């Protein structure tokens, strides 16, 4: 997998007006290609669900028909409904950040809910992916290629809830937050 130089990293963000349990974005599908995109390439727009529980990406029969895709093989897929055989296809997937994955093997499947594409970990592992739910609004963002580790533990000081209040976790030799006068490591830090 060819990684883009950091100077070419691109990102997109999808914000919702409330909390959601399904992450959806617009994406494009076209015929696969090698090298730079051909000038006459046409992509068709679809709604995609982003699913970290899916190993690989999936397209529906409607996309297969709409794009005139030809099967490249058959594989066994494992879903919540069990194992089954599925046709495979090569497609180019155009993400909202204007990055294209020019030749990706996808399987045919049933998605439902008006969604035609499932974006799986085969795409998500190529970049940085984060979901937040600040102020009761879901937001998800993706950039490619990966630029840095996102670690909420390192970004936030450690805290505990003590008697209904959030307090910073003291270092092991600090006085304990409970007011006992003992060192934290000999009190609540055991």
Regions found by a protein language model. Give the residues of each.
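Pepsin/retropepsin-fold aspartyl endopeptidases
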Residues: 1-177, 184-190
């Amino acid at each position: 997998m060819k990684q883009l130089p950091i100077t070419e990293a691109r990102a997109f963000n999808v914000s919702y007006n409330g909390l959601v349990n399904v992450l959806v974005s617009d994406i494009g599908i076209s015929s696969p290609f090698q090298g730079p995109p051909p000038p006459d390439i046409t992509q068709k727009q679809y709604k995609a669900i982003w699913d970290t529980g899916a190993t690989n990406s999936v397209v529906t029969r409607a996309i297969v028909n709409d794009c005139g895709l030809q099967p490249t093989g058959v594989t066994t897929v494992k879903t919540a409904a069990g194992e089954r055989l599925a046709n495979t296809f090569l497609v180019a997937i155009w993400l909202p950040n204007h990055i294209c994955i020019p030749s990706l093997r996808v399987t045919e499947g049933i998605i439902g809910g008006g969604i035609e594409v499932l974006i799986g970990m085969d795409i998500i592992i190529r970049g940085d992916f984060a979901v937040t739910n600040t102020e009761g609004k879901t937001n998800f963002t993706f950039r490619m290629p990966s630029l840095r580790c996102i670690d909420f533990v390192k970004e936030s000081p450690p805290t505990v809830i003590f008697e209904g209040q959030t307090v910073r976790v003291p270092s092991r030799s600090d006085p304990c937050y409970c007011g006992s006068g003992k060192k934290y490591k000999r009190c609540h830090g055991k």
